[in-house]
Amino acid sequence: MKIIPFSKLTSIINKGDVIALAALSTANLPAEILKTLVEYNDEDQSFTDFTFMLANDISDYRGDSYDLDAFTTRGMIKRLITSIITASPATINAMRNNEIEAYYLPQGVITTHYRSKTQESPGTISKIGLNTNVDPRYTGGKVNERTTEDLVSLIEINHQTYLQYDFPDIDIALLRGTYADMDGNIYMTHEAHLGEGYSLALATHNNRGKVIVQVKAVVQNGNFNPNDVFIPGKLVDYVVVNTNPKLHRQVMQTQYDPALSGHYQITEMREPYIELGTRKVILRRAAQFLLEGDVISIGFGINNELSNVLSEEQVNHLVQPNIDTGVFGGLISSREHFGMNYNLSARMRHDMTWDFIYNNGLDVAYLSFAEVDQMGNVNVSKFGEKMNGCGGFIDISQTVKTIVFSGAMVVGGQLSYENNKVTVEAQGRATKFVDKVGSMDFNAENAIKFNQEVYFVTERAVFELTHKGLKLIEIAPGLDLEQDILANMAFRPILSDDIKLTQSDIYQAHWGGLAQAIKSDYRI
């Protein structure tokens, strides 16, 4: 391991390199390394044709940092392989305009494939992604017309069908830790999550690439417990020491919060409780599907505020909420800090989290939907002007026992919640229950085949997936079935013989009924 100044990086990284990072937004983001590369390119425009490989988007949501958009707008990226983009609008535009090659592939597959690289395996072979948009019988994960090379192929082993993911070898791993010792061992002491940096370092080292780690400081050997080593020094080629704290923030809005790295626990949520409205009503109804002891996965979108509802109802101790980034239990942060937990009970490597998920570790997954069709197929990745990608949606939805899809039934609708009922003030645009989904991210036929329980919770009605398609099983009190629900769908769902009314107490400002629901013997 060599400790080098940032200026030396430009002699190590070359035009056309395959560069991989293990960051989530600004967490674990080696921003000062990225700044160095961007500024060097600004001088002579020689740092181009990079392939970037990321499990998550890297952005601080402000548009003025050294992140994915900074590289895209300068024409530095030739190809992007990722699972999700939520806050890099310039990169989305570049993909839409065919300015770069791009792939959206399952986050768990991207994260765990680094181990395949270390084992000299013929790519990653998995059933994850079969019969979805990443299957080559659909798009193979290709985002636009400029993207032509197949990274995913269909193969058969012992009369069973699999997908084979063939990722490029990694030339450069750009990682971040809190400290390095004189032997190059990396410690994640102040980081909010561990990420997949260890596996990425292994894969890069195996390819004779270079592993570069940005840290806050280099310390003498023996300062830390050897059990706390995250990346052994033998895997690290270069260490650079941060000179500007703003380019080494723990998370987006916080330089360093010890509670986010598990060093102490907070007494209550640091985010205000959600006001009574459509989001809160949906989340309350969705939470009623929980049972005591459930291990749950909370996805991006509306569900990232589910932990807020659990906390307000004082039921956090009855279930274990998890995020697929590797943080288990506790209070899940929402919005810009989504992916970080307060009061976490365990912290695992990102790739190990997918081992847990793939091996039936979850009981219930709370996922969002953008479009759903009559058969119950779901699109989350590409709709309207949005093309955010699948994230871990495909990995989770193909492995969990029970799925609760949550979302508003219409776009722009206005509802009021008074006297324990719902009143529609404005219907909104019916764009979510469609004839055909724009991207096959969840294949309902697969779910039926593997006996998954699947529900769709909206502010107006609740649906259940059956082998014949979507069945309406519940409507909100005060609504007209034809005018307020069916008129906002492009198809007519199966109607239950016993359509129930949603429990009216969830429309009160203060509820207090979730604990009783969770302690019941069945999902309601």
Name each model feature, range by range:
Residues 263-278:
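Glycine-rich phosphate-binding "P-loop"
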Residues 282-308:
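Active-site pocket-lining segments that scaffold enzyme catalytic pockets across diverse folds
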